[in-house]
């Protein structure tokens, strides 16, 4: 299915919504980066063979909740980026109700000062042969607090499920806090599921290598952090949008590296 990703630009999402519900009809495609506020509670219905790419960029305090229902052979990609605001809370519930549905959720957050960001993700595999990905990268500095809770539920009838989950966090200060809780709940036999969460610091060995090549310590830290964020940013399908998001992240990192 082809999507004109040039149209994944800032746009008023309200014209696609009725009664807080965004519907993508059968075999339709929609790629959008909403302009302005997203409804705090948004129901998303994706019908058979439909495709949705939705990017939510948070540069101010915000609380959002997405509830996604996917029919057979549908594909959804959600991009959740938290780069500003004292407090950002993101909640996503995905129900894969039809066979061969695919859902990918990519998240990046950079928290500093006393900012508090949270991501609460649940993907429910209710049908056979569905796949899901949760890929989150977090950078935490100063006295910021970031949490990630990701849950994958696989029903008894959801055979041939493929579910992957990964959350990695870099701590840049001793006072920064992170809470991660990946969780798998599996009732089927024929599945391929993995989950993992790591918390660490910038590699001293790589920093030393870069400095030995004449790169300043500050620039070396910035390069490593940009590479870390790029694991998520490169999943964004529109090149122009990737570049603008990278610029925003670089500004955030420059202030906190």
What are these regions (language model features)?
Residues 228-238:
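Short arginine-rich
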Residues 209-214, 219-230:
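Extended amphipathic alpha-helical segments enriched in small hydrophobics
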Residues 4-208, 212-215, 242-257:
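Conserved beta-strand/loop scaffold segments within soluble protein domains that form the structured core
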Residues 115, 137, 224, 234-235:
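Short amphipathic alpha-helical leader/targeting segments
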């Amino acid at each position: 299915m082809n999507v004109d990703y040039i149209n994944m630009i800032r746009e008023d999402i309200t014209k696609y919504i009725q009664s807080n519900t965004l519907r993508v009809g059968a075999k339709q495609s929609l790629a959008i980066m909403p302009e302005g506020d997203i409804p705090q509670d948004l129901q998303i219905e994706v019908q058979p063979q439909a495709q949705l790419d939705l990017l939510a960029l948070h540069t101010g305090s915000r609380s959002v909740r997405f509830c996604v229902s996917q029919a057979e052979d549908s594909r959804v990609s959600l991009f959740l980026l938290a780069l500003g605001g004292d407090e950002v809370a993101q909640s996503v519930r995905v129900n894969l109700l039809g066979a061969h549905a695919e859902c990918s959720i990519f998240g990046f957050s950079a928290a500093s000062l006393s900012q508090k960001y949270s991501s609460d993700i649940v993907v429910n595999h209710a049908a056979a042969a569905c796949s899901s990905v949760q890929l989150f990268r977090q950078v935490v500095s100063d006295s910021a607090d970031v949490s990630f809770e990701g849950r994958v539920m696989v029903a008894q009838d959801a055979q041939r499920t493929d579910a992957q989950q990964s959350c990695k966090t870099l701590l840049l200060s001793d006072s920064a806090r992170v809470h991660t809780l990946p969780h798998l709940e599996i009732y089927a036999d024929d599945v391929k599921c993995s989950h993992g969460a790591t918390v660490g610091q910038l590699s001293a060995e790589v920093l030393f290598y870069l400095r030995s090549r004449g790169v300043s310590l500050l620039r070396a830290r910035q390069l490593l952090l940009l590479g870390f964020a790029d694991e998520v940013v490169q999943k964004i399908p529109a090149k122009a949008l990737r570049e603008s998001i990278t610029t925003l992240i670089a500004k955030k990192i420059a202030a906190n590296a």
